[in-house]
Amino acid sequence: MEQAPNMAEPRGPVDHGVQIRFITEPVSGAEMGTLRRGGRRPAKDARASTYGVAVRVQGIAGQPFVVLNSGEKGGDSFGVQIKGANDQEASGALGSDFELPENPYSQVKGFPAPSQSSTSDEEPGAYWNGKLLRSQSQASLAGPGPMDPSNRSTSMLELAPKVASPGSTIDTAPLSSVDSLINKFDSQLGGQSRGRTGRRTRMLPPEQRKRSKSLDSRLPRDTLEERERQSTNHWTPSTKYDNHVGSSKQPSQSQSPSPPSGFSRSRQTQDWVLQSFEEPRGRAQDPTMLQFKSTPDLLRDQQEAAPPGSVDHMKATIYGILREGSSESETSVRRKVSLVLEKMQPLVMISSGSTKAVAGQGELTRKVEELQRKLDEEVKRRQKLEPSRVGLERQLEEKTEECSRLQELLERRKGEAQQSNKELQNMKRLLDQGEGLRHGLEAQVMELQNKLKQVQGPEPAKEVLLKDLLETRELLEEVLEGKQRVEEQLRLRERELTALKGALKEEVASRDQEVEHVRQQYQRDTEQLRRSMQDATQDHAVLEAERQKMSALVRGLQRELEETSEETGHWQSMFQKNKEDLRATKQELLQLRMEKEEMEEELGEKIEVLQRELEQARASAGDTRQVEVLKKELLQTQEELKELQAERQSQEVAGRHRDRELEKQLAVLRVEADRGRELEEQNLQLQKTLQQLRQDCEEASKAKMVAEAEAAVLGQRRAAVETTLRETQEENDEFRRRILGLEQQLKETRGLVDGGEAVEARLRDKLQRLEAEKQQLEEALNASQEEEGSLAAAKRALEARLEEAQRGLARLGQEQQTLNRALEEEGKQREVLRRGKAELEEQKHLLDRTVDRLNKELEKIGEDSKQALQQLQAQLDDYKEKARREVADAQRQAKDWASEAEKTSGGLSRLQDEIQRLRQALQASQAERDTARLDKELLAQRLQGLEQEAENKKRSQDDRARQLKGLEEKVSRLEAELDEEKNTVELLTDRVNRGRDQVDQLRTELLQERSARQDLECDKISLERQNKDLKTRLASSEGFQKPSASLSQLESQNQLLQERLQAEEREKTVLQSTNRKLERKVKELSIQIEDERQHVNDQKDQLSLRVKALKRQVDEAEEEIERLDGLRKKAQRELEEQHEVNEQLQARIKSLEKDSWRKASRSAAESALKHEGLSSDEEFDSVYDPSSIASLLTESNLQTSSC
């Protein structure tokens, strides 16, 4: 807000709250735009025609609000203005995180309350006829362009005409002013005089003290920049109705491109308030225009309206329902609302929780049904594939047996061929030996012949030679004969071998073809089986994985439901507590505001009294003393006012602090409510983090290798440090030797002291030099000591880190021990699993035996039932043949009787009786045959039922066998998983061993570091001692000469020492960095080991669950076997009962045959006896003619044929 140029008195430092000032002169044209904060107009005319009180009240977020004193245009206007800071301060206030506490009298969106009061004092029967707008002195928002200065109003707020919309008229009626309010209340109170005192002292009764619902459903406040960007909202004429008041929003006009610098916030506040009230109601209500009232004194208490479904929303709805058409007071209605809410709250909580649980349970049941359906389909498919698989397995076994038989034949033939080859080789060897002998003998013969030719000696020698020749010839002939025999044998063997080879080749070719054919068939069958088994196993594995996932999801959802229920209960309790705290703070704030308003009223009264007294004193009294006294009193009152304002500001700051704390608590509640959503995201992130952890494990292994390399580098560096330390020790020894030399030189100089005064002068000069050098040495020593101190500190830090590393290693050792224990427990569990597997195998063998026994018994039962059926069929055939014979006999007898009846004419009555008896007997026999036939059908039906039961039992046994095979596959799978677990455990042990090796390496490095540190400390102590000795010697050698060569050597040595110390510091920094890296790697390894341990525990849990499932399946198999035993026993009992029934039927049939035979014999005897008593032929012809006899015979034939 801009300040007026004709400001006379200084303005007070008022930024917030209420400010009251007197106005005793009309507002000039230059002052029509704004009212200054805390400023007063100069008191030129004390007795002006108009006066008033401008009350400035802090609004929401620093927004102003003004009520006119007079509604006439062009006249003077004074009134209440909600005053904020200047433009910059207001923007800052708007941008701050300031939330107001909940208004207990607020109306919720969508439920408008009746108009109880307004900021403007309207005439009776007038509702919202216009809207409060800014004064045209700053920027007129009533029209599209600025107004003339002559047309401007002197009031702060002016009732501007509404923007013309299609089909609407312009209403320029102003709001009624504060004077009209005073008149109205004066008239209501009856007789109270109009004036300022009446306004101050008049108190409304409780029934008329009504708060406005202007901003009860305000939205979260916007920033000043956003409000300045928005266009000014214009309102269409509102409709008046009985109970509810609202407003509807029309399209806004564009804002002027260059607003004036003194832009007032009262219009912004008004537009924003109306817009925030309009937005939620425009969605829920009809297009009918609802009225809206806003009051300036209660805008601070407004807060965001509760969303639909909340407690406040329910409270507002119940309040609106109870308030309609009721004449009760507001407190009684609110008490009823609170009672209804207390009774409804547990029902709402139960309904919300039950709906969520029912929805989750429905989803779970649907998923379980889908999984069960998939499992049933898989079982059916596997049952269909099972018979083909059994046949293929049988073919496979036959083919394998044939292959093994052929392989045995091949091996046998190969052995025979090898033996024949060996014999051939032996024969060839013998032939070669014979050939060699023949060649040798021929050579000998040739030699002898040569000797004979050469030696023509005496005859005895010739005879000897001839004898030798003969013997050799005989030997040669024998050898040739043996050779021929051997060759013949060889030829025979070769022929046999060629024949055998040809036969073998043919057999091998045929066998190879058969084997190839069988192998191809076997491969095809095995491929088909493999594919089917792989598909079945994959589907089964997928189903099991889905089932496990669903079970895990169900458990997780149950846990989450329990956790969410607990969390909701906790948060509800917290929310209730926070609500109570908010209400308490709200009540405190309301009390503080009431006290502040009372104090402001008292201050206003005091200030008015003081001003009146001051004016009276100025007008009447001329005494300066009284003026000074009044001035002092004014100053005191001003000081008191400032103190009160400071107290008020401190109270406001405390209220703001409380509001901020409440906002923080609300934010914490919202954050805690959002945690439930974040849990699902965290579950997804956990899977990603697991993959990242695996990648990190691989990277950790790589980093481990790098760490080992770095450890090797560290060892080399430590060796270098140790060498440098040894060199420093050697240099220190040299330094000691030089010091000893210096001491000797000093002794020599002491001997030369007696030489003379000239020598003393030279020695003094040298002593000065020595002192300077001594100072330099001391400085160098101090520097070296400081460097040693820094080295010691670095060593301490390294030791501390190494100790931490040792602790981490100790922790790793403990974790390794726990892992070893876990591994031992897993080994025990595996042993238990193996035992369980052995037991399952034993149970499987027992089940196989029982199934085989049951199959054999069922086969026996089937054979017995077939035999019984065959016997019954044979008996029935016999019965049929007997019946046919009896019918033929009866027909023959009937024919005989007919011929005899033709011959005889007597005994018709007897014959008719006999015929009737025969008919009855035939009917009885037919009835008995029918019963026998029915019994036979019943027996056939029972046999069919038994056969069906036997087939069902076979099927169930096949299903049981399939289940057993599935159990075997599961056991094999579990064994494979156990092997995998063993491999993982071995890998874990390898990693643990590597960790141990790393720990040992780190321990050795720590020991080396400690030894190096001890050496350095010893060197440091020795150096300190040497320094002390040097100091003492230098102090004693003052005044004696010292050679300069030794000083230069000492300086060079000091420089070398400094360089070495710097190098050591660098190496120490490098060592520190490597130690840090090692510590990080150790931490990563520990994390990796923990993850692996958790993974092992998870796998252990999975194995335990699978073992339980297998045990459950075994129990189910045992129950099924017991059920099959019961069915077998039941079938045996039924078969025994059937045998008994068959025996009974056979006995009955025999008795029937005996009865029929007896009846037939009796009837034949009676007919023979009664044949003589027949009547004449006419009588026979008349009573029993041939046509009747033929009909009887045909009836009997038909009856027999039907039987």
UniProtKB/Swiss-Prot annotation:
GO terms for molecular function: microtubule binding. Residues 358-1160 form a coiled coil. This is Cingulin. The gene is CGN. The modification Phosphoserine is found at residues 96, 135, 137, 140, 155, 165, 214, 217, 258, 276, 338, 351, 1175-1176, 1182. It is found in: Cell junction, Tight junction. The modification N6-acetyllysine is found at K579. Residues 54-67 are annotated as: Interaction with TJP1/ZO1. Belongs to the cingulin family. Homodimer. Interacts with TJP1/ZO1 and SPEF1. It comes from Papio anubis.
